[in-house]
Amino acid sequence: MIKRENANIDGDTAMGTMLKYGSEGAKYFVDNYVLPKDIAAAHINGDIHIHDKDFYMLTETCCQIDLIKLFKNGFSTGHGHLREPQSIISYAALACITIQANQNEMHGGQSIPNFDYAMADGVKKTYAKEYYTWLAASMRLETGIDDDQAAAIVARAKSEITEELRIANMDAYGRALLDLKPEGISEEDLKKAHDFAVAEALNTTEKQTHQAMEALIHNLNTMNSRAGAQVPFSSVNYGTDTSEEARMVIRNLLTATEDGLGGGETPIFPVQIFKV
């Protein structure tokens, strides 16, 4: 018995049955009114195979989606506009929505060719947010400065430091922070606050990234598309972004995949492709 047609279509549901009726009708129409008779006969006899023949005249097949370009300044699904995501959890959630929305517009698979690069941007934003939060908290707790003073130091750091704030560059960022010489806190205390913020930001970002990848795995194996008849046929490509942020994403994606969906069920999607 076929449980899932084409790996992702539940033919036992009402909408799955309706899709099957439409599919068979479309294939009959293509065979009898669109294709040359010899080509239609070759397919029927099994000499050739025309994949997804039911969609032959309707829409494009299989799309690679550039999430970096799509997420910049936000995008519309056709049902509403979504602002640019600002955390790894939002990046993962909107990646699922993107795949789901596109699956409703075309047949075939929906692929993200630069998954590691795209999700690394989300990790970078999350890490920066966590770092500044922990930096302010540490300065308040360890030195006794008030909220306004801590916020002012963080604001100066954001506006005046030109060093890029990312996981592999925190030593240089720390030196630039000390060069600000803010009032109300010693250089020693500021360095301690920085070191503490770096460690805690890395820890909390790792946890949030795992949650994001776990949610992505669960969503892509359960969320409906095409009127509830199937889950999107999704794939992600990764392996060429060697930044710490990208490696954090893929490490947690693999861990979440290994953990499975629960009840001993192995996730079918996304198909994971390692690029070289």
Model features per residue range: what roles?
Residues I2-V276:
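Conserved catalytic cores of very large enzyme subunits
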